C-alpha cells in the first residue's frame, strides 16, 4: 500500500479507510477471513477485495453501510491511532505552504509522535526528496517505524534520538535540510544543533510548533541568538463552512404561514378555556389498538425541482479552540 500513488481496486493486504461518519474514520488492513464490526453492521474483508476505492459497501445483513476510501495523509490524520497530540490539517497545510515544501525538498522533523505530519511531508517531497524524522520515546519510535514501513514511505528515515542533547547528525548521511519542523517541549535546546545539518547552499526555513506563549518567547530568543531571521509567529484559527440550499418562499407562502400560526393560537386558546378533557381530540380516530395519530406533513427534499432554491452557506458559530503557536524563521547560509 503506497501513499504516493492511487490504485483503483482493493487487494488483500491493502490499507482501507472506512468512512463511517464525518467524525468517524477507521483504518482497516484487509485480510481474508476477517470481519470489521461497527454499530451499523459488520463488513467482511473477503467482500472488500476486488471492490473499487470510494465504493459504498453494504453491511453483511443488508443494513448499514460504509465507504471504502483510499488512504491519504489528510484522512490518515483523522483515523490513525493517537500516541501523542497530532498536527491537524489546518496547521499542517499552512506549514507546508509557508515553508515552501515541494518535490525534492529535504525535511528535518523532530518529534515524530504519531507520524501524522511525517506522512504529509513524505507525500509532498515525493521520492525525489527526503524526510529525516526523530523520536526520543522508544515505544513511539518503534510504532512509527513499523507504520512508515507498512505504508512504503521509502523516502523517510526515522531515528531514535533525543535531538535536544544529541543533535541531528546521522552517520554516513549528508542531511543538508532546507526545511525544519520542531514539535518539541523545548525547541530552544535543539536549535543550536541545526547548523551542522541544514543546507549550506540555500536558505533554510524553520517552524516550531508550541502550545504555550512562554515556549514561544524562549524559542524566539534561541532563534535570534543562533542567526535565524524574519521571525514571525502565526496562529491558525479554522472554522468549518457548510453549503446547502434554502427554499425561496413567496409572499403568498408567508401569508399562508401567518394564517396557520394565528389559527393554531386561536385553537389553542379555545382548548385552554375549555379545560382538560378525558376525550381525545376529534381528529384522532379510535382503532382496536388505541387511537390513530395524525399523519406527519410531507417532507420536501432539498433541491426538489418543483420548488425554487437559493444556494447558501453557514459557518460554525465559534472558531475552533487554540492548538498551537507556529513560529517561523529562515536562515541564509554564510558566503
Swiss-Prot record:
Annotated spans, Disordered: 271-302
Entry-linked PROSITE patterns: SAM_TRM61
An annotated GO cellular component of this protein is:
nucleus
Per its record, the protein catalyses: adenosine(58) in tRNA + S-adenosyl-L-methionine = N(1)-methyladenosine(58) in tRNA + S-adenosyl-L-homocysteine + H(+)
Q: What's its top-level EC category?
A: transferase
Keywords attached to this entry: Methyltransferase, Nucleus, S-adenosyl-L-methionine, Transferase, tRNA processing
Biased composition range(s): Basic and acidic residues: 271-281
Q: Where in the cell is it found?
A: Nucleus
Residues annotated for S-adenosyl-L-methionine binding in this entry: 114-116, 135, 140, 162-163, 183
Classify the main location.
nucleus
Q: Which family does it belong to?
A: Belongs to the class I-like SAM-binding methyltransferase superfamily. TRM61 family.
Q: How does it assemble?
A: Heterotetramer; composed of two copies of TRM6 and two copies of TRM61.
**General function of this protein:** Catalytic subunit of tRNA (adenine-N(1)-)-methyltransferase, which catalyzes the formation of N(1)-methyladenine at position 58 (m1A58) in initiator methionyl-tRNA.
Q: What is this protein called?
A: tRNA (adenine(58)-N(1))-methyltransferase catalytic subunit TRM61
Origin species, per record, is Candida albicans (strain SC5314 / ATCC MYA-2876) (Yeast)
